[in-house]
Amino acid sequence: MTPDAQPIPASEPRHAHEVRWDVRVPVRDGLELSANLWLPLPSSDAPDETFPVILEMIPYGKDSWRRNADTSRGRWLAARGFALCRLDVRGTGSSPGVALDEYTEVETLDGYDTVEWLAAQPWCNGNVGMWGISYGGFTAIQVARLRPPHLRAILPMYATDDRYRDDVHIRGGCVTASEKSQYAVSQLGMNAMPPYPAFAGPDWRDRWRERLEATPPWLMAWVREQTDGPYWRRGSLAPDYDALECAVFQVAGWADSYVDPAFRIQERCRSAVSVRTLVGNWVHSFPSDAYPGPNLDWLHELVRFFDRYLKDIPNGWEHEPAITWFEHDYAAPEAFPAAWPGRWRAAGTFPVAGTTPSTWHLGDGTLAPEPAATDAVDTIRHRATTGTSGALSWGAGWHPNGLARDLRPDELHGATYTTEPLAEPLAVIGVPEAVLHVTASMAVATCVVRLSEVDADGTSSLVATGVLNLTHRLSDTDPSPMPTRGLATEEVRIPLRTTGYRFTPGRRIRLAVLTSYWPVLWPSPMTGELRVHHGPATPSRLVLPVLPASAPTLEPPAFRLDPPV
């Protein structure tokens, strides 16, 4: 904000509304998809008033388990002068067709056609936004890539720019296990649900049978496609970040798996009208109720964003910090923490101005600013079941998965490198990187690195994780086995998850190196050893993006607590 400006609150509720169930939206191949609409009604003093509309398109059945939540949110938005459109993706819910896979090209074109159809309705002011959490956030980004003329703004929450690098299928070239299986099974069940009989008509059973016979299990393609290529580029914004031109407001969470994409979009989407990112501690759920807190009134922020870009209200949105994050402190590890301690911080760019790399060298169980004096090697025998002290999914965090516990049981089966107790706080914002010199006796090996803070009692609390299938060390499109003969080491660079954290004086920083992360990733099917080399000839190290206390930052926005909706 400029020094003399104050942010304007979101639109207040002043409209009655009507609901239109099962509105049919025509798309270019002749299908008519099913949508539910919550429409604000013009006030008596402005009978010709028209309204912007916010579209959410997902395959989770708007007329079944999502209906109550949609109704609550639709009423709330309509009262504030926004129409809400909930569209069933083709082949799901009450929409006809077949859902052959997630994020197909025809599905994205359906989104484009729906945006333009909505903009042409007599009750619409011609301005359309999209929003969604997870799948709905993905589709918002994917449709925005096509640049529909009337799509002004999108709000993706916990979404990705790169389906290969950051989704439930592949991580660091490793095939995921728990999360891919959970999602594949749940989506198989949802795709098998019948269309809503009241909307589908008397032949709903026949349509249901056709859907059951024609819809494949999506898992088959995910298992088959283990290297990057055209399959994963479909639906990915990367590498064409300039395709995103509308205004963007992103929501992400440190405890979720989609935090890296938010920071990449913030950094690389230079053609967008504006890009703004909000990162809390949260798992894969709404900031009003997700753990760990603190929580906030995310709907108020949603309405302020859409007020600016769908209603053209000059509320100061574009003058507020581009990135706001919760810098969290040490918390004793637990699966379902109510909140993490810390503070909100803000900056105008990412990478955050003033951030400097801080290098910590691996030694004989040590992590130090100075390189080790002698060369040495640590040998880790591969154990496929190591990993269960961490979170049981890459980022969903829902019951019964939860977040990471005390990491020490896993660390017994790896190599650990630990600093002396810190004398000063150390604030990190950005992407930590482990640079390791390794050899292996396995042609297929996984390297898992965990960054943690160690309390005085020895408890090791997770800060961030990075993984690499070492066959992908040179390429995600053309993997190559690790050499198992000879003495030459290979330098591998393993980025950890983007992190906003403050290490506290008196505690220690630890880097642990493991060979598996079960049940999150499928382990290497081979037996053998991974060796980590360190010393003058093989300078393995951890590089942290440190924000000095003297670095200039901005005043974070003053968020509201969440009201009942």
Label every PLM stretch briefly:
Residues 5-9, 278, 292-565:
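C-terminal, loop-rich substrate-recognition/catalytic regions characterized by aromatic stacking residues
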Residues 7-49, 418, 422-424:
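N-terminal cap/lid segment of alpha/beta-hydrolase-fold proteins
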Residues 44-119, 168-169, 443, 455-456, ...:
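Cap/lid segment of the alpha/beta-hydrolase catalytic domain
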Residues 70-71, 79, 145-243:
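Accessory cap/linker subdomain of secreted extracellular hydrolases
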Residues 122-134:
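Alpha/beta-hydrolase fold nucleophile elbow
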Residues 132-142:
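Glycine-rich nucleophile elbow surrounding the catalytic serine of serine-hydrolase chemistry
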Residues 244, 250-252:
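Short beta-strand/loop motif that positions the catalytic acidic residue
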Residues 260-275:
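Active-site-adjacent alpha-helix of alpha/beta-hydrolase-fold enzymes
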